[in-house]
Amino acid sequence: MTRINLVPPEELMDQHLFAEFREIKMVPKSLARSIAARGVEGVLSRIPPAFTLNTGHVSFFYDKGAYLVERYALLRAELERRGINFNRESELDPDGTMLAAPWCGHYTATPEALRIIRERIAEKIALKPHWYRYEGKPII
């Protein structure tokens, strides 16, 4: 599963923060595979019009490369601030797939998208509240 959480990284539990940092890098790779299989127009025609956590979550971000670059920088900064060990050499898009049009667009999360993702995060935390940590400390 690949997740892009949309909320400010400061809101994320340590586990969600690190997982998103690791998984966000899957979007450019998935895009490259999709372009190879379907072509540019085929990929563009399948991008969902609105944020979703279901089928289409990854493809929703295919044309939002600038957003992902900004998001990746925010995730890295928050990992650094919290003192979480991560691969500082790791790049979001080493092949530059998302740097060119039509893949390099921006995105601003809608209130509805933020509501959806916050609900999902709360559901996940409720399933294992003793497992989650924030800044290295248990949340309960």
Regions found by a protein language model. Name each.
Residues 1-140:
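Extended, charge-rich alpha-helical interface modules
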